[in-house]
Amino acid sequence: MNTPYSIEHLLNPALRNIATYKVEGGQQAEIKLNQNESPFDVPQWLKEEIIGEFIREPWNRYPDILPYRAMEAYANFVGVPAECVIMSNGSNEMLYTIFLACLGPGRKVLIPNPSFSLYEKLALLLQSDIVEVPMKSDLSFDVEAIMKAAHNEAVDVIVLSNPNNPTSTSMSYDAVRKIAESTQALVLVDEAYIEFSRERSMVDTIEELPNVVVLRTMSKALALAGIRIGFALANAPLMAEISKPKIPFASSRLAEITLMKVLANYRLVDEAVSAILSERDALYEQLRMMEGVSPFASDTNFLIVRVADANATFKRLYDKGILVRNVSGYHLMEGCLRCNVGLPEENRRLAEAFAELSVEVKG
């Protein structure tokens, strides 16, 4: 009998500390509210316009090393020089790129806890030291604790998901700026949900503050999760360095054309965001009146809802065809579910399901 071949010696030892990414409950449901996507698809007429232009492109040729036309369009859209912008295959690609550029064995990254799980995964893969700073009990950022830990631990990178996933809370513009001005560390501000926020973006600081990098995604407000488009923004000298590990040719011509067409029709995004915010606030008001159901005020396109038994409630919702995200395993989020805002009918069904739970709590 042959001895089983062990592959362990072939692998980076850091993989022992990393789990494969999974979406609990899968990605298919009658009412899908678990991945913070926009409930509004790109309209058919705009899809046809995009595909019509893409068909005329040569498919046998590589795209540009970087999608320069789309980068210039986005730079003009946000009001910064084109050399301060880089486009990626989703913002996660630039997250990988920036971590590769700035972290490694013996280097330190500060991450508020809880926050987006990919930050920790990448830091572990790169064998960097993680400095965790707990959020406050109301799931708000502890700004003073962040600055103190950054100084005492001499961290190399500070990562701020702002607004924060999974808590749905934000740090003020002034607070983010205060952190950036108080440290020599790179301050990476992940603004995946900024279009839904009451707070100002940090984009207008990138040429003034030499250590600030802003991440943006087109997967949420712009409804392009299936196309995979993200951006990083930083001052030109910093951008030139942190983009060195980036994979060339990572953005397709389809992504470039799509981005430019959506920006040219941005009123569609504005209308969708307005509708989502209206639904978010209405859903929050409904849920907070229910006994045994405690929603947190949100600055994103999702609500965090605390219940007595998150696991049981997740299953009951799933059995009703409603898929949400169980985030009860995160620090400070015991009993919590994450529900992104859907279409009006989907939100009505979700509220009805929570209302049934509330009636049972009353007994």
UniProtKB/Swiss-Prot annotation:
InterPro entries in the cross-refs: Aminotrans_II_pyridoxalP_BS, Aminotransferase_I/II_large, HisP_aminotrans, PyrdxlP-dep_Trfase, PyrdxlP-dep_Trfase_major, PyrdxlP-dep_Trfase_small
Record-listed N6-(pyridoxal phosphate)lysine modification sites: 220
Isomerase as UniProt keyword: no
Record note on quaternary structure: Homodimer.
Descriptive protein name: Histidinol-phosphate aminotransferase
GO biological process, one term: L-histidine biosynthetic process
Pathway: Amino-acid biosynthesis; L-histidine biosynthesis; L-histidine from 5-phospho-alpha-D-ribose 1-diphosphate: step 7/9
Gene: hisC
The entry's keywords: Amino-acid biosynthesis, Aminotransferase, Histidine biosynthesis, Pyridoxal phosphate, Transferase
